[in-house]
């Protein structure tokens, strides 16, 4: 594979991957880099995907593309560690972070980021989802994301630029990562992005939200999305016990109010009695987003109660 000298690289596109076929994404991004005309590199870090054939196919495509590297971890390290590893490995002055379950939908994705590179320390391009549900087993995630997409227009994200932060599709100066890192204590799914946004704010890093969205294609099944939600709520509870993310999440803030009102015990009991009914709805073909919000709140309260009892 052709390589540029270390001092020649202007832009590094950095992709975290775990069990996703990212061949089309690599080909599309490589084409974008060629049209952009600058000197760049693409680096993929595979977080020890279990599907060997899929990984082999990704590596095969990466090796056929100039200035593209595909690395594989020897064990699963989590998104936060992987993003820090990629930032350290990158040779470009500017870094574009992308999740592997993304799809490029317009020809000026790279050029658009490059055009606005001096506007802020971090540019957030955003994301959107398909207009129709590709899988009836993914109805909960589809409905949840489509509702969230209404708030993902750049000007709406800009109202609260740090609280709307997601690392799914961002561009940053490499210098940023000498001051702010993804928190590597976030080993499991959830909240590493939000915590990074909090740290950016603390360090006075500027964020600018632009319309340069990628399509998110990784719609989990209802079962998978609920499992991920449970893991993310445990992550949030652990972070808050360490004094992090205080006041930075809606579900955590509401749980705090319920605790101040002396109703946490009652909420925990209600969850025990209604968990089965809630899951029956959420795993079905017509899940309610209202019930999903109720589930998350009650689940978080229960997780926190269990953690408090263990620590006593």
Language model features by range: what are they?
Residues 1-31:
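N-proximal low-complexity "stem/linker" segments adjacent to membrane-targeting elements
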Residues 29-72:
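Acidic donor-binding segment of Leloir-type glycosyltransferases
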Residues 73-90:
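Glycine-rich, basic loop-to-helix element that forms the pyrophosphate-binding segment
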Residues 95:
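Short aromatic/hydrophobic "clamp" motif used to bind/position activated sugar donors
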Residues 107-139:
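Conserved donor NDP-sugar-binding/catalytic core segment of glycosyltransferases
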Residues 142-162:
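Short, flexible, basic/aromatic active-site loop/helix in glycosyltransferases
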Residues 188-196:
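Acidic donor-binding loop at a coil-to-helix junction in glycosyltransferase catalytic cores
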Residues 231, 248-312:
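Non-catalytic, C-terminal membrane-associated alpha-helical segments of glycosyltransferases
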């Amino acid at each position: 594979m052709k390589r540029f000298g270390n001092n020649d690289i202007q832009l590094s596109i950095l992709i975290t991957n775990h069990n996703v076929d990212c061949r089309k994404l690599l080909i599309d991004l490589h084409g974008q880099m060629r049209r952009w005309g600058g000197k760049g590199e693409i680096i993929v870090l595979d977080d020890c995907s279990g599907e060997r054939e899929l990984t082999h196919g990704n590596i095969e495509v990466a090796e056929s593309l100039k200035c593209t590297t595909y690395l594989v971890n020897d064990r699963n390290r989590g998104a936060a560690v992987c993003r820090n590893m990629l930032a350290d490995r990158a040779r470009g002055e500017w870094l574009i972070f992308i999740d592997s379950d993304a799809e490029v939908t317009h020809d000026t994705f790279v050029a658009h980021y490059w055009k606005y590179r001096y506007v802020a320390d971090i540019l957030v391009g955003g994301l959107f989802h398909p207009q129709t549900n590709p899988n009836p087993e993914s109805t909960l995630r589809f409905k949840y994301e489509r509702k969230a997409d209404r708030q993902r227009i750049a000007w709406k994200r800009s109202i609260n630029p740090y609280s709307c932060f997601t690392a799914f599709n961002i561009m940053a100066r490499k210098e940023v990562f000498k001051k702010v890192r993804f928190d590597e204590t976030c080993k499991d799914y959830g909240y590493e992005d939000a915590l990074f946004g909090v740290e950016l704010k603390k360090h006075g890093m500027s964020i600018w939200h632009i319309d340069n969205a990628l399509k998110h294609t990784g719609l989990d099944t209802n079962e998978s999305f609920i499992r991920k939600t449970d893991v993310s709520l445990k992550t949030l509870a652990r972070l808050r016990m360490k004094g992090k993310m205080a006041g930075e999440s809606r579900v955590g803030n509401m749980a705090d109010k319920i605790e101040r009102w002396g109703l946490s015990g009652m909420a925990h009991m209600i969850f025990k009695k209604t968990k089965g009914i809630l899951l029956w709805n959420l795993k079905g073909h017509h899940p309610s987003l209202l019930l999903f919000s109720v589930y998350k709140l009650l689940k978080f309260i229960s997780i926190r109660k269990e953690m408090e009892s263990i620590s006593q």
